[in-house]
Amino acid sequence: MKKAICALLSLFLLFGTLTLPALAAQDGEGTGTLPVSGEPEPPTDEPPTEDAAPDFAVLPFDDETTLIRPWRSELSGEWVLFLPAGADLTALTVETGADALLLGGTELHGGDKTDLLQPDAVLPLQIGERELTLRVLASENLPSVFISTESGSLDYIHADKSHKEKGRITTVENGEVTLSDAELKQIKGRGNSTWNYEKKPYNIKFDKKTGLLGMEKAKKWSLLASYVDQSLLRNPLATYLSNAMGLYFTPDYRWADLYVNGEYQGNYLIYESVEVGETRVDIHDLAADNEEANPDVDDLEDLPQVGTGPDGAVEDGYVFGSRKWIDIPNDPATIDGGYLLELEYRNRYPDELSGFVSKRGQCVVLKAPECASEWEVAYISSFYNEAEEALYAPDGRNSLGRHYSEYFDLPSLARMYILEEYAAEYDCGISSNYFYKDADSGLLVASPIWDFDIAFGRTDVVYDDMWLRDPAIWFANMRFERSGANGVTVVQPTVFNLVYRSAEFRQLVRETWQSYRELFAPANLTAEIDAMAGRIEASAVMDAIRWDLHRTTASDTTRAKVREQIGAVRSYVTGRTPALNRGFSENAALLYYEPNGAVGFMSHNAISAIGDAVTLYGDSRGKTIRLKAPEAGLSLLGWCEDPNGDGPVYAPGDRLTLQRQVTTLYAIWGVAPAVVEHTALLGDVDRDGQISAADARLALRAAVGLEVFAEKTDAPRFLLADLDGDKTITASDARLILRAAVGLDDLEGKTVTFTEPETPDEPENPENPENPSDPENPSDPENPSDPENPNDPENPSDPENPSDPENPSDPENPENPENPENPENPENPSDPEKPENPENPVEPTADQEG
């Protein structure tokens, strides 16, 4: 065994990338020509370059397929050996093609066992004349997965995501080999934006159903790289919440350290793929029905792809209402399910085999059956379009009279919305959102979850400083996609954006959120995060060093950085839960995005929400909402760009065209006036009780822009002038009013009922203290017409008011000059007993006597 491994290792090092399984395949056990470019260079006598792999490897387990070799850090120049968890660190087998090597000053030969390779050790390594530095890191707690490609390299697979290659796989759990050198039918790239990163995600497929790391047997598995999520926790946290909330068919997963062709690739999430199957999305398998109905077709994927374009072509681009399918000769007996649908970005949609673009512009991919027939795509697209029409309708009903609740399973939709909103998952409602429709079911069920690495306060590297880090934002209920068709750009609101406008759905969300308050409690989630973090920390440190995430190979420094990433997730959930407790309260504010323009819609007279202002982003980044809770009894009167309310105030429901990339609006609070209901004749624009030419003139002025009848702020005139009910005042409306005024048309006494704020001159308002015309208002101190108001000191008409010093009609007023009994009145000429009165003509003065 020792000599065989040493000989193979020498060849491995000469050719640079060939692994043991690859060499075995070329020795008669292979499967054909390897998909590699060119031939390996012949060996030379030149000394190895600085970055050439050293003649050194380690066998951590008693299985030759687990042989691993060190990786060179370009940053430090060190060679780093990443050891899997469960290896016996006191007796690791060293392999080398050299006669001997010096490790930490100890001479070792191929096949020797050593205890020198301890975690965090930094050792000198000398092989012949090469003097190297070897840093040792070791994982803990996690299983390890060893994959070898048929070519012995990842170059062909990395050249294009569609490239496939055969391989073999070994798994180790708790130090025990649980799957040894099993055949892989294929390994290939996967993902969308994640495929563009240095650390690649992969899909693997077995020939037969195989269990991995204790999970249920299946053929397909996904290896997620989590490159943008340096905490490595976000997908697992979403999975934990999904399972706890009872979302259907939540994919299972395991963390694992992945080695490919002997080189450490990092910490990966081995996830169950999203597909129809007994152990996955367990609904009726319509794809199997298609195969059974077409026994003469070896592979349905080889049949032509057809579309609704001219002559059956698949439309080149993004066309509303278009469909595409596979030209399958025979349909099954029934085609009502099961369907697994994925909402997708428009730029990714062309790569899919079967799908449709809804009449409103939503791209929908058929994940099952992937090879769908024309009638299958027609059936499910018609069903989805009806559901979408109901979502767009103000009353939630489509033109068939069917409510959106007749198309969607609302409990699952509410749970999925809450999870997407809580996580502020970047693709929510646009991509990686799945719905399934089973056979004999009339509902789309929101499940399963997928792809939460850009969530929980984490953004894509490109948008690293975006507002998504803020835990006090609305996101899922405002998400949209900007789309283009035939030179026209539209804004496509998501299913969550649309359904959250429904008061019934919001109430269901509030009730559902309340039922999971303990699950989302910060104490519960931070405890779960800490448990996850403790399990993967050693592996996370290795992963960060392997991919130079923190520009260091020092484990202590890297560990501190990893903990910072964990802390960011903890901080997010700590702030997110109380924010949504407010956001999902009975009187929370709502801001949603209206399609076909950069228009923010504020609705609901709200009195509490998530912060202190609302920020609207004029580009595709989305919208946020923050409202400061006012004092008790106040209502939201509108929004203003000035925090003090100076300037235009936009009423809830008004359209606001964003003039800049970012606009901040402040909530204006106050006591809302009482509202009264009025009824007027349709066409009586000036509300004088009759339809006349003056009404037609007002409507015409509005039609040509000389008058402005705002639908929200001038509702009465708008409603009375809009005779054809198209929510626009046109010359046609003015003409209809004029015809009615001159008797050519009869409006049959049609009326319009509307509400208006109660005004201070309303004569029937007994509570109005400023109403001078209300004779029955006893509490109005300024009402001069109330003769019975004893509290009015300025009321000259009250003869019984003894407290009025200027009342000339009060005979008991001591200052009344007409009061003959007033001895204190110095100007009273009629007082005969007042000798001090110089003007008293009756009583002579003292000077006049004598």
Predicted regions and their residues:
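Cellulosome-associated attachment modules in secreted, modular CAZymes
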Residues: 4-5, 16-25, 671-776, 780-782, ...
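Low-complexity, acidic Ser/Thr/Pro-rich repeat tracts that form intrinsically disordered stalk/linker regions
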Residues: 20-66, 673-676, 757-764, 797-798, ...
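Predominantly extracytoplasmic/ectodomain segments of secreted and cell-surface proteins
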Residues: 32, 38, 48-118, 130-136
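Secondary-structure capping and domain/repeat boundary segments
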Residues: 65-79, 586-681
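Serine/threonine-rich, repeat-prone extracellular segments and beta-strand-based repeat modules
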Residues: 99-125, 642-666
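Conserved oxyanion/phosphate-binding beta-strand-loop segments in alpha/beta enzyme cores
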Residues: 165-225, 372-379
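Internal "kinase-insert"/substrate-recognition segments embedded within catalytic cores
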Residues: 208-211, 225, 246-251, 263-418
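Middle-to-C-terminal accessory/interaction subdomains
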Residues: 349, 362-430, 435-590
